[in-house]
Amino acid sequence: MKPTPGVPSTYLCATCRDEYGVSSRKKWEEQTEIWLNESGLLWSYCNKKLPCAPTTRYPDYMFVAREHCVLLEVDEQEHERYNPKCEIARISELMDSIDFKSLHVIRYNPHAPGSTADRKATLLQAIRDALATNFGVLNESGCVVQYQGYSQDRIVQLDALSCAMQDQHK
């Protein structure tokens, strides 16, 4: 695993949360967990370090399928108060932790416009689709990021930064 320039690899999520004034367990993560339980979608890891992972970062919810993994991140307010480099480095380090599997990341903003019922239905269907189809294998990096409830400006910003950070590692 290569370190990400400008982002300390030893940064703990709790440290980031303290630095940016975010509580450690958010109500929308708890609500999402209720939805997952109600729908029968079972995750393998939630808010804890992956076994034997070379990183201290951990997923909100990690689902393990036969050929790939699906990472669900509950990003309140598009995580706009978070350091974007830290966000991208975190996903990269989690990708490095799932040895030879491709990764489908769903970044879900529970504060997007629209009804909670519609956001719930869309999210649960996205997870089912991601588990059924290994979309990550279609991308050279082995990783695909799907944004739910994000503004187009934020998606463009994060994608551009992600590409720039990947180019630094080449």
Predicted regions, residues:
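Nucleic-acid endo/exonuclease domains
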Residues: 1-170
